[in-house]
Amino acid sequence: AYIPSLRRVRRISVEVKSDSLLGTDHTLEDFYGFNGRPMEHDWEYVGSTNILVVAKSRYRETVYYGPNGWAVKDDYTMRQTDVVKQIPKKSAHPYAYKFIHIDRVTGESYYANAFDKAGELWKVWQLTKVWSEDPWVVLDGKGSDFGWKEKGQFSPKGTNFQLFQSINVIDLQNNRGTLVPCRGTEAPNQNLKRAKR
């Protein structure tokens, strides 16, 4: 990542995946709920629960409000999620454990809650979503192009999938948050010739 104040590119080693990412409350491992090496953790299925999530935002961009500006102002819907507990095997990991809520239908993560070594809630992630076929999900003004466009071909009509709209983390112990209003721009590749084993 290029850091303008240093006029340098900072390379991010995969070995520091549980360290703070560029001064934010995120780590490399935290993106999308979990973005690490599964074998470096023990996993437990906790159960299923219904939670309120932003599964289909009504806005083009994430709208924040509230006393700290951390809450997402949008349409919330009830979704059934499976909850898994992630327990790091390495004692030097900053979290004692983390719960990840995964949508039963789409497989998308909406929330994650990390706890410190004392068992106190430390960080909460919220991932808001949009759908690929929403009218405002357009990158070039001419039509959606989410990486599936290959040689002028778009994904078959009716291919509808979720994209993240924001990745937000609230550090409850330090009373701060990192809000990342962004949009996922990649989609499953529909070209079977490019599929690798």
Locations of the language-model features?
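Gly/Pro-enriched, hydrophobic low-complexity segments
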Residues: 1-36, 69-184
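Long, C-terminal catalytic modules of enzymes
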Residues: 181-197
